Structures are given as structure tokens and as C-alpha cells.
């Protein structure tokens, strides 16, 4: 493989027509965005509808320094608008009513839609907004959504935005416990789900999971009043021979069918004009303490940032067909399946299936079928598909592709080069995007026509984003070096707070280095100024792009009656990027056996979700702890990869435990 110094210039055909067509042009706009952010973003704002315009003197106000008062970020204070109006009504009025907003591709290739136009999408959103109003949902109410990747999902989100309700989407791979915890935290008034869905050859009965979650949330002391259910299973192809549908559990006066509720509703609904800083949505992300954090995004700034990053990073032009494979249950789906594309009048594919069903060429067949021009997926998927070689790719015509995106975790150079060579045929730009639930949109990314690409590097900051590298003492690292990745000024799309917990927001992101937003990630800057994300610097795990905390997994493991203590670390995985390696100390007189391992894997799967299931569970008679009782995780990470260079262990209470843990490494870890 080429050394990291290898640079791949953008295809001149892409640069020629790109919004940002050279690195010099990028640098010019970037400097403007830092020197005068209010002027830069007010130009962007002119393309959108504002019921009340912004006061230029109040365009940006912020405090990042906790020692100077509460952390506060405000963009366009005093302005009012409605996000749904800007995404749908504005585009219809601008002549895009008959343009396709979404093609839907189901789990089975026989299930697909011929396309939902902007006009039809607006009508459906208004109908469902009227359904929500009839069920008592008003501005500021929280609505939880737990759905598969079907067209009703963006319709539900936009209906919430239209009436000023705050949506809280929970990825439909999360367990009922996780759903209940999130509904309880946000005090949801209503839940929207589907009876079920197919994932590959496996049926998922979502309504049954929701019923379990609704019972749990009731036990916690909160009642979710209504549940609206999409009848999805009957309209799609079963993916198992002789499949018999399970009965859908139902509670009268609480549960309502979506199609029945929509029947008599008006296809018009006046939008609720929202203040610029009114909440738009909240999305839970894992916290290092184990309790999920309700990241809150607001109206105006998020609109500006989602729209601009989508347009510039994917270089989207009228007539292009864009496909992001992310589930809308994650921030990538919010910003780059729904809000960003629709703000630009784009045509997108929404995909319900998996990369491997019915064959391992499914992604390439979808790209061919819809003539996709921009494709955005995760390194995990790319690495999994690399295993099948070039054969499945060659069966399909991918010649329409112009931009290939990567998201969720750093992409290793081998996967980058395979993506570039076999999917992009060395003609496409690869945008390796770094960002977080908290940032709202891309913060470090190449631009397709402007940035010479280095395999594995996220490259340079987006407009308005000012990254800094700090050492452990908070001293800035200039030039080449590696440290904590922080940002010193706000961009419009960044989170404003954690729902109902501003103190935790300040403590998590602003207390370690006063004056800076701390990402929790490390980064390295090379001699050319390129940034390379080195991974989490806190106790977080990134498995197949799913961020979770060690505390979250450990708390499940230690609930088992035979377990005294547990510690979880990540270790590299060729497909998932990272996998979970768990150390388990059984209770006194308990045996560590295969049944315990199976039980623990099952518990994690059920309590958190299938993506969190540990790859390795090791017997640990004791854990490497300092004399103050703190687990030395860096030692456990070394044991997980069988690296005996563990460094200084003199502060350990019992140094002999390290050798014992090396000796105990299970066969599957070797």
C-alpha cells in the first residue's frame, strides 16, 4: 500500500464544475468564514425564507469559556422561520413540485417506489401534521420515533418540524430498554413506529418491542399517551419461505394505525413560525458515564449548516441522484438523508435493506438502478464488501458516480484505496468526513473539486470551523503534532445544550479546556497541515460506526448474578473497525464457563442492541487497578491485542495480575 504521503488530486472534470473548484478558492472562503462569520453565514441565509429577518447585530453571540459565565451559542437571534416550510413549500414554489424528493428501495429488491415528489411529500407531511395536532401535539412537545427506513419516517420528522414539535428518533436496532430510557428522559407524549420490518431474511417485530418499552417507561413513572403505527409488513415481500406473520399486539385507545388516521386529513397545514433558537430535534448519543445524552439542535443554525455542508461537500447539482446508506436513527440520517438534501431540492434514495441481501452486490445494484451520482456510506460497509473482491462490483454500471463519501469512523488507507479504485474507478473524489452528533454536520472534510486527497485523512476544516490541537495541559500544538481535537469558535449547526441538563453539557464539552469545545477525539496534523483523526481519548467505543460507552456495556455485564466486576475495552477489528473485548471477574465460588459467556452476550444484545454484542469475553480473576482503585484501561487494551509492552505498571496495587491476564487470553482472541 502507498505511504501516507501519497496524494490524489481531484479529477479535473469534477473541479471544473465544482462549487469550490480549487484549494486556493477553499482557503479564501474559509478565511472569510473565520474572520467574519456573521457576514459569511448571512449570505447563506439569503436563499431561505425568514418570516422575521435576523438582526445583523445579533447574528452571532456566544461564550465558550466556562470561567466567564454559562456556555451559550446563539445564531440569528430574533429571526423566525419554519424548517419544513424551507424544505418543502419553498421548493414547490420555486418550481420543484414535480421533482422526485425520494426513491424508496425496500429490503427486498421487488419492493420499491417509483418516487415521491416534493408536492406529494408536502401534502403527506401536512396530513400527518394534522394527525399529530388532532392527538394533542403542540409546539415544544416531544415525539419519539422508532421506525424502519420507510418514507413515513421523513414524513413524521417533517410533520413535527411543521408544527414545532421536537422529534426524538431512536434507532430501531436499539433494545426496548434503550427506547424506554430515552422516552422517559425526554418525557415523550407520543410514539410513532411500524408493525415491523425485514432486515435481510430476519423479521423485526417493532410494535412488540415498543409495547415492552411503553410498559417499562410506565414503570419508570411516565406515560406515553399515544402510539401511531405504520402497517408495513403486509405491503412488502416476506424474505423467508413459508413465513407466518406474528399477531401485532394492540391496545385500544392508545394505539392507532397511520393509514386510518391519515384518511380524512387535509393536505394543508399552516406552519408554526419558530424562533431561530427554538429546538428542532433531540438525538441521544452515548455518554462516557453510561447515561445517554439528549443532544439538542435548534432551528436556524442547523438549517444553514445542514444545507451548506450537503451542497458543498457532496457538490450536489440539479439532476444528480444522491444516496446515503445511513439509518435515520443516527445523526448522519438526520442531516444527510433528510434535512440537508431536502434543503437543496435534491433527489435521494432511501434504502431499507442491507449490503448483503439478497446478494453481496446489493449496494452496487442500487447505484446502477437509480444512476446514483453521490454515494455516502461507512468504512465498516466498505471493509465488509472488500472481502468479496471486484466480482460483485463488475456486474453493475457505476459510471455515474462523481463523489464517494465515508462517515462514522476513520477510514483505513486500504479501504480508502479500494473504494477509490474499484468503486470510483479512480475518477471520483472521496470525502472522508469527520463530525459528530453534537456538531450537526461535517466539521473536517475534503471538498470534491478542491482538496488533494490523502487516503485515511479527513484533511481540512469546513467553513466556520476552527480546529486546534492541545496537549494534556491545554497548550496549543502548532504545526506537526498530535493532541486533543478542540474547536475555538462555534459554527451554526453545533448543538446548543443537552436536553434538561445544561450542567452536563458544560461539564462534558467545555470544562476540560476552558474556551474550547472538546470533541473527545484525538487528531494528528501532518507536515502538510492535513488532519488525521486518531480516535476517542475518553472511555468510548466505536463499533461499526456505533458510538457507545464502556460504562454502558459494563453496567449490563455486572447485572448478571454471577459477575462481580467487569471492564470493557476496544480492540481493532478488520471489518467493524473496533470490537468489544470484555474482562469478567466472576463472583466468589462461581465458575467462568461457556454458559456465562453466552448469557452475557445475550444480555448485552437485548439490553443495548445487536451492534453492541462483545466479540471476546475473557476470564479475569482480578483487574489491573491502581492503589486508589482505578482500573488501568491502557493495560487491558494491551492485553486485548497481546502486546506485552504494557509500559510502567509500578502504580498497580498488584502487578502480578497483568501476567495472569495475558495467560488467560482465550483461544478466539489469539
Swiss-Prot record:
KW Nucleotide-binding (keyword) present: yes
GO molecular function: acetate-CoA ligase activity; AMP binding; ATP binding
Localization per record: Cytoplasm
GO CC terms: cytoplasm
GO biological process assignments: acetyl-CoA biosynthetic process; acetyl-CoA biosynthetic process from acetate; behavioral response to ethanol; photoreceptor cell maintenance
Broad class of the protein's primary localization: cytoplasm
SUPFAM superfamilies tied to this protein: Acetyl-CoA synthetase-like
E.C. number: 6.2.1.1
Pfam family for this entry, one: AMP-binding
InterPro entries xref list: Ac_CoA_lig (IPR011904), ACAS_N (IPR032387), AMP-bd_C (IPR025110), AMP-bd_C_sf (IPR045851), AMP-binding_CS (IPR020845), AMP-dep_synth/lig_dom (IPR000873), ANL_N_sf (IPR042099)
UniProt keywords, alphabetically: ATP-binding, Cytoplasm, Ligase, Nucleotide-binding
Catalytic reaction(s) noted: acetate + ATP + CoA = acetyl-CoA + AMP + diphosphate
Enzyme class: ligase
Family, as annotated: Belongs to the ATP-dependent AMP-binding enzyme family.
Free-text function comment from the UniProt entry: Activates acetate so that it can be used for lipid synthesis or for energy generation.
Protein name per UniProt: Acetyl-coenzyme A synthetase
Organism: Drosophila melanogaster
Taxonomic lineage: Eukaryota, Metazoa, Ecdysozoa, Arthropoda, Hexapoda
